[in-house]
Design a protein with these regions (language model features):
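Positively charged n-region of N-terminal signal peptides that target proteins for export
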Residues: 1-9
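Core dinuclear metal-dependent hydrolase active-site scaffold
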Residues: 23-76, 135-201, 266-293
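Structural recognition of the beta-strand scaffold that forms the well-ordered cores
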Residues: 34, 44-46, 51-55, 78-82, ...
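Active-site metal-binding motif and surrounding structural segment of the metallo-beta-lactamase
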Residues: 48-52, 59-108, 195-212, 225-230
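N-terminal post-signal-peptidase region of extra-cytosolic proteins
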Residues: 63-68, 215, 326-333
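Cap/insert and terminal regions of metallo-dependent hydrolase folds
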Residues: 92, 105-113, 190-266
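Activation on beta-sandwich/Ig-like modules and their edge loops
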Residues: 286-391
């Protein structure tokens, strides 16, 4: 069955116009805008006046996505792809649907688990507009135009142990170059694609699962041989990413590596003539720089979070949002200004110590598993984070 699928995928990619580097034109250009929104994923692929969104980050990142679309004059999306059902990928979908920005097509993998179809985040977003989701399977091709297309490589089968391994894997091919988009794919799904013969070399690789140590097997890298790779992550939020082993493997094959956390607002990667011709650190026009000097401290036993201003100037946190990633509970701050050296303590409904503000939740912070608190500014950008000290 997998041999048959490999043949079908090869035919699909030929029909889609996959061409050699020697035949690629230097006239066309493809760009991948990778937002620096912490560990969450949100990518905007643009080619010949078409625009395609791959994932939408957390709900709290909507301000960043909205800003990106505005700054690049994107008033219509040709397609929105949800790679899989995790909140750091689908969180912004509903706000996008409610924004009024036209979306020509909503796409998601036909394979997932542990979510009823009626509650699937892509279904909910599309249905809020009276629209439907196009379910994708390996071998499907989405034409882009001007010699470009997306080919669906995976998933090949449902994985009921880890939703990351149900990630929609897309191969974008164009005269400008090719991009392999992996969602949060880990080694298990990588090996499915290797065994099926689904993979081919790419110009740019968007690594799976934030570049952790359960991605990029040697056999996978030998097939895709990227010129460059981009990793969407935040070491502050997820200390094990990117893994040293991941960075070493990419370096060993001569692959240039870009990390979203190393840019300011976004990273714009440009492909032309079958090569990566640019990787620009983007700063939003007319948007203030991220604040500095504010820290978080979580006490999961007391169920409190303390915000401190360690800078020498007052800091306004009006309109900022706090997120607890374990339960994805959020709290919007209003009218709060921290003086130099000042602090603000927020507790849940069951907190017994003295606090400055009550978060209307019984238990905000997990006292059993690792929970990360993130403070987002009004433009959807994380400005600081801290965990609860648990594994």
């Amino acid at each position: 069955m997998r041999k048959v699928l490999a043949i079908l995928l090869a035919l699909a990619m030929l029909a889609a116009g996959v061409v050699s580097a020697a035949a690629e034109s230097t006239e066309s250009k493809a760009t991948l805008l990778c937002l620096n929104i912490g560990k969450a994923d949100c990518l905007l692929l643009s080619y010949e006046n078409t625009h395609w969104l791959i994932d939408a980050g957390y709900e709290q990142n909507w301000g960043a996505l909205k800003t990106a679309l505005s700054q690049y004059d994107v008033d219509r999306l040709d397609g929105v792809f949800l790679t899989h059902c995790h909140k750091d990928h689908y969180g912004g979908l509903m706000l996008l649907a409610q924004s009024g920005i036209p979306v020509d097509a909503w796409y998601a993998s036909s394979v997932w688990f542990d979510v009823k179809e009626g509650q699937h985040p892509a279904v909910l977003a599309a249905a809020s507009r009276g629209e439907e989701v196009s379910w994708l399977s390996a071998g499907d091709v989405i034409p882009v135009g001007s010699g470009a297309s997306f080919t669906v490589l995976g998933p090949l089968e449902v994985n009921e142990e880890n939703e990351n391994n149900n990630s929609l894997v897309l191969f974008f091919s164009s005269p400008a170059g090719s991009i392999l988009l992996c969602g949060d794919m880990k080694i298990e799904e990588e090996m499915d694609l290797v065994d099926a013969g689904s993979l081919t070399a790419c110009t740019l690789l968007k690594t799976g699962h934030h570049g952790d140590n359960k991605t990029l097997s040697d056999s996978f890298l030998a097939k895709v041989r990227p010129e460059a790779a981009v990793i969407s992550t935040s070491t502050a939020e997820e200390p094990d990413t990117p893994a040293p082993s991941t960075l070493r493997k990419l370096k060993d094959i001569g692959c240039a590596v870009y990390e979203t956390q190393e840019c300011r607002d976004a990273l714009l990667i440009t492909l032309s003539g079958g090569k990566v011709t640019g990787a620009d650190d983007i700063i939003w026009d007319g948007v203030p720089a991220r604040i500095e000097g504010v820290t978080l401290e979580i006490d999961c036993e007391a169920d409190t979070v303390t915000l401190r201003n360690t800078s020498g100037a007052p800091v306004s946190l009006d309109g900022y949002t706090l997120l607890s990633t374990k339960g994805t509970k959020s709290l919007r701050l209003s009218g709060l200004t921290l003086e130099p050296g000042g602090q603000w303590v927020i507790g849940g409904r069951k907190t017994t110590v003295t606090v400055d503000q009550t978060w209307d939740e019984k238990n905000v912070w997990s006292n059993k598993k690792r929970d990360v608190g993130i403070l987002y500014d009004p433009w959807g950008r994380p400005v600081c984070c801290a965990d609860n000290g648990l594994d």
